[in-house]
Amino acid sequence: MNKFNVYAAWSTLCVSLVFPSVSKAGQYTNFDVSIYIPVGVVQSFENPQKLADDWARISRQLKVDKVYVEVQRNRQEANDQLLEQVKKFFLAHGVKVAGGMAASDGSIGGQFKTFCYTDPKDREFIKSAAELAARHFDELIQDDFFFNTTKYDSDIAAKGDKSWTQFRLDLMDDVAENCIIKPAKAINPKIKLVIKFPNWYEHFQGLGYDLDKEPKLFDGIYTGTETRDPEITDQNLQQYESYQIIRYFDNIAPGRNGGGWVDTYSIRYIDRYAEQLWDTVFAKAPEMMLFEWSAMLRPIRAGERTNWADLRTSFDYNQMVSAWSANAPAGLEPSVARVAGYSLEQVDSFLGQLGRPIGIASYKPYQSTGEDFLHNYFGNMGIPIDLHPEFPTNADLILLTECAKFDPDLVAKIKSQLAAGKSVVITSGLLRALQGKGIEDIVEARYTGRKILARRYLSSFGAGNGTVIGDEQASDVLFPEIDFLTNDSWALVRALAEGRGYPLLIMNRYSKGILYIWTIPDNFNDLYRLPVEVASALKNYVMRGFPVRMDGPAQVALFAYDNHSFIVESYLPVATDVRISVAGGKAKLRNLVTGEILTGQPDNAGGRGGMDDEPRMRFNAHLLPHSYAAFAGEP
């Protein structure tokens, strides 16, 4: 059985990851890199020497293909002469130039405030800003403030009997068309208009972001992949979202998702910034946008990384600084731009060997909510997710969370999948939402509303004794209770509370297919507290037939591709061991960075109840903190 340390993946890169020379665009093989320049920074370029000095410092550390020059933010506008001056500078340096604007109107104590789009003066201001951009640029991106928060008297009167969600959807569709698109194209018919959607996609519709109509109104979309710190921020976004949201938006606007956008905010250690960049391009984003120019010039703060500071992790801080010091002019310290450059140069060396991203098909209808962001917790458990805005009928197995309830025809679609011999996994939240709406015609299981606190677990398949799995000293987890009919449904994984078993995964045969019900903890973070053996028992069914699988602790993600390549990435602050299982006759794994060949052993894990009989090979991996490894399967 082979074992390796992830730091070996970077040993051959150390020589090449050194201080880059000042250069023109087109330096990356698998993606472009761009920087967004807010209007306040643009105005500082009234002094042309500052622009030249900034560019000299940034371009020494980072290969830049494109910049986005902002024309307006918080009612602060750049003038025509300055915009032309800045544009000409970058074009002269071989850098592509686009415009940007932010429809923000300041804040109230840090709480975002938008324009009031029922106020004719605000509408006219936004229109004039779009026209300003159109006079100077052939592309314009809307920063992620293109939503509405105001509930002024004029808004209340215009809303009438509509819900706030419907009112704001209609309002922002109108603003997009009549205050941005038509005015800009009247000035510059060839301008490409792009809307950047932020990271809080579960709640878009409530503030007027329309994932259904706006991608059709605009020429392109862009994706906010900034997940920052999952604990200290108010959003608590999970790391996997930096990858998953790109894939979801790719499925919304195939071929028109321009890239991912990451900032430097709310991180406790510098590795977290690198992880957001990596995960964005692991999803095959064509462009990596860095927000923003002045942040690239700030000193690097390594942060709270003492536990792994001396390890050869994927973001090898010491190696980065050492390589810089050996090549940089005396006294010139690296800035955040070098962190971005170092991180992106690493992954650019192997991304071209990865195929098309794949995952477990899942479904989030337009304008839906329910079990918000749960898909990203699945991703952090090592379950790759491929999220779609339309029901993915071609998938052999579909994983449905509560948000799918917004499809009025959902039960009929589930029946069709099962009748076709396919499998459907629904969460306990979706079961609760579908009670009384037809789910009983498939399975008579019930979300009771009662709760159980458990720390012991069993697995089984048919009648008889179950097998104890996991550490009996595991943490307590609070689950909802699901009732089912004995012998109609079967509990595959159970939680034990004071000697009584409660189902965590139920299977029910319907027509030619199988319906599974997955009981989700009240606190999604408790998914990470499940013993490894319990998570593995769940994956036996949820990932049935998937070509690659990773078993190990939570907060280790798996990114899979359609050419038998994959990446495993740990977000943990400690080293960890994982087991990898691959199908498709792949007896070896080739490290895509070092070329090392790993030879596997037959995977006789069993425990799948005869549900997954395809031969598989297993490999062991040792991952250092906040590190990843990339592989391709070979015969």
What are these regions, as identified by a protein language model?
Residues 37-45, 68-77, 109-127, 160-174, ...:
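The substrate-binding groove and active-site-proximal loops of carbohydrate-active enzymes
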Residues 61-73, 125-166:
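Active-site groove signature of glycoside hydrolases
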Residues 50-74, 132-141, 221, 277-291, ...:
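Catalytic domains of carbohydrate-active enzymes, especially glycoside hydrolases
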Residues 110, 138, 144, 149, ...:
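Hydrophobic targeting/anchoring helices
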Residues 43-61, 119-133, 203-214, 269-280:
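Short, acidic/polar
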Residues 28-53, 81-138, 148-152, 178:
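Active-site-adjacent "subsite" loops/lids of carbohydrate-active enzymes
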Residues 375-376, 402, 406-635:
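A conserved amphipathic helix/loop scaffold
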Residues 71-106, 159-187, 405:
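Aromatic-lined substrate-binding rim segments of carbohydrate-active enzymes
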